[in-house]
Amino acid sequence: VDTTQLLKGVLDLAVLAVLRAEDGYGYDIMRRLRAAGLEEIGDASVYGTLRRLFNAGLLTTYVVPSEEGPHRKYYALNAAGRDQLDRSGKVWRAFASTMDSLLDDRGVAA
């Protein structure tokens, strides 16, 4: 099953959720998403999502010097980002619950 369209619909929420636990730079965020099970996530999708969330006022950034190469731009949730995560998380949970019910009622195995 091609999950590309599903990922597009939930990538903002996934990035916000990853940043709830800890600030991160682009590659680190992508690595954490993949480790959580979103292996198909592309680099461009993650970086584009970070830019979009920042431009929407949901993230702040800061630069940290790195001894292993160029400085790293870290992303962090701000108050608006936490509010958006809470709202989107509630919508997602309700949607997922509805889909679970539909699949269970039709005898579709989990």
Region locations from a protein language model:
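Accessory beta->alpha helical hairpin/"wing" motif in late/C-terminal subdomains of nucleic-acid enzymes
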Residues: 77-81
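Short beta-strand/turn micro-motifs at beta-sheet edges
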Residues: 1-5, 63-64
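N-terminal helix-turn-helix DNA-binding core of bacterial DNA-binding proteins
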Residues: 3-47
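Amphipathic alpha-helical dimerization/coiled-coil segments
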Residues: 83-110
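Beta-hairpin "wing" of winged helix-turn-helix
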Residues: 56-70, 76
